[in-house]
Amino acid sequence: MRADLDAFLEHLRSERQVSAHTLDGYRRDLLKILALAEKAGLSDWNALDTRSLRTFVARLHQQGQSSRSLARLLSATRGLYQYLLREGRCRHDPANGLSAPKSPRKLPRTLDADRALQLLDGAVEDDFIARRDQALLELFYSSGLRLSELVGLDLEWLDLKEGLVRVRGKGNKVRELPVGKAARQALEAWLPLRAQAAPEDGAVFIGRGGKRLTPRAIQLRVRQAGVRELGQHLHPHMLRHSFASHLLESSGDLRAVQELLGHADIATTQIYTHLDFQHLASVYDRAHPRAKRKGNADGGNDP
């Protein structure tokens, strides 16, 4: 079994030319399946059937493997069996039609509107770093950009006169987004300082040396701003989540929020309706005179 696995990995490396990172992922996942198969006394990939594989996956799930990790493992297993079938080394694919167990979907973390304003309304010093960081924070929250979209943003895609920005999102799809007044003002204050840094290319957000900021650098600046202004760790995607949640709460227009976020499937956007309900329930609990009543005083059953 190990020889077949090694042959498949070599096929991925030499013929499919997958990256070293992807190859390592395949190796780790398939070694897990191999270890479980050998522990069960199996000596051939043909001996692994769907029922056994389902049992293996369930065992890994019980050990704490996430649904995403298990889905990746099953994908790797399907790839192995497709290769073995083409090579005439096995007669079936036990992973065909098998899905990873679903875990409860975690709701995205957001800032409430007051906390978002607290983050953005602090005093800003008139220097290179402060103006740049304020501009990128404002743009994250104003337009709901992904981290990769902000990193890749070039000047030619920014139209401050019209208050618009174009970004290239997932699947290489381009979308046009509005830029709010506060974000426009922050960008207008930043761009003259950017020009003085001899930028190497058209990147909107650069370091002092003129190079485009990396994702890691932006994550660090956002986190530092969160600690400084809010006393909490903050991630760029939390600003995107806050943008979506606050917009949906104000407008109720799920389809518009989907378009602005660049979601291909509206089901992805619907997660924010759960956040909106959480907020409404919280307001109800705080404000409604009957919200925290434990039961009727007289124990009656009147409707």
Swiss-Prot record:
<dbReference type="InterPro" id="IPR013762">
    <property type="entry name" value="Integrase-like_cat_sf"/>
</dbReference>
<dbReference type="GO" id="GO:0006313">
    <property type="term" value="P:DNA transposition"/>
</dbReference>
<keyword id="KW-0229">DNA integration</keyword>
<comment type="subunit">
    <text>Forms a cyclic heterotetrameric complex composed of two molecules of XerC and two molecules of XerD.</text>
</comment>
<dbReference type="GO" id="GO:0009037">
    <property type="term" value="F:tyrosine-based site-specific recombinase activity"/>
</dbReference>
<keyword id="KW-0132">Cell division</keyword>
<comment type="function">
    <text>Site-specific tyrosine recombinase, which acts by catalyzing the cutting and rejoining of the recombining DNA molecules. The XerC-XerD complex is essential to convert dimers of the bacterial chromosome into monomers to permit their segregation at cell division. It also contributes to the segregational stability of plasmids.</text>
</comment>
<feature type="domain" description="Tyr recombinase">
    <location>
        <begin position="106"/>
        <end position="285"/>
    </location>
</feature>
<feature type="active site">
    <location>
        <position position="146"/>
    </location>
</feature>
<protein>
    <recommendedName>
        <fullName>Tyrosine recombinase XerC</fullName>
    </recommendedName>
</protein>
<dbReference type="GO" id="GO:0007059">
    <property type="term" value="P:chromosome segregation"/>
</dbReference>
<comment type="similarity">
    <text>Belongs to the 'phage' integrase family. XerC subfamily.</text>
</comment>
<keyword id="KW-0233">DNA recombination</keyword>
<keyword id="KW-0238">DNA-binding</keyword>
<dbReference type="InterPro" id="IPR010998">
    <property type="entry name" value="Integrase_recombinase_N"/>
</dbReference>
<dbReference type="InterPro" id="IPR002104">
    <property type="entry name" value="Integrase_catalytic"/>
</dbReference>
<dbReference type="InterPro" id="IPR023009">
    <property type="entry name" value="Tyrosine_recombinase_XerC/XerD"/>
</dbReference>
<feature type="active site">
    <location>
        <position position="170"/>
    </location>
</feature>
<feature type="domain" description="Core-binding (CB)">
    <location>
        <begin position="1"/>
        <end position="85"/>
    </location>
</feature>
<dbReference type="Pfam" id="PF00589">
    <property type="entry name" value="Phage_integrase"/>
</dbReference>
<keyword id="KW-0131">Cell cycle</keyword>
<dbReference type="InterPro" id="IPR011010">
    <property type="entry name" value="DNA_brk_join_enz"/>
</dbReference>
<feature type="active site" description="O-(3'-phospho-DNA)-tyrosine intermediate">
    <location>
        <position position="272"/>
    </location>
</feature>
<feature type="active site">
    <location>
        <position position="263"/>
    </location>
</feature>
<dbReference type="InterPro" id="IPR011931">
    <property type="entry name" value="Recomb_XerC"/>
</dbReference>
<keyword id="KW-0963">Cytoplasm</keyword>
<dbReference type="GO" id="GO:0003677">
    <property type="term" value="F:DNA binding"/>
</dbReference>
<dbReference type="GO" id="GO:0005737">
    <property type="term" value="C:cytoplasm"/>
</dbReference>
<dbReference type="InterPro" id="IPR050090">
    <property type="entry name" value="Tyrosine_recombinase_XerCD"/>
</dbReference>
<feature type="active site">
    <location>
        <position position="240"/>
    </location>
</feature>
<dbReference type="InterPro" id="IPR004107">
    <property type="entry name" value="Integrase_SAM-like_N"/>
</dbReference>
<dbReference type="InterPro" id="IPR044068">
    <property type="entry name" value="CB"/>
</dbReference>
<keyword id="KW-0159">Chromosome partition</keyword>
<dbReference type="Pfam" id="PF02899">
    <property type="entry name" value="Phage_int_SAM_1"/>
</dbReference>
<feature type="active site">
    <location>
        <position position="237"/>
    </location>
</feature>
<dbReference type="GO" id="GO:0051301">
    <property type="term" value="P:cell division"/>
</dbReference>
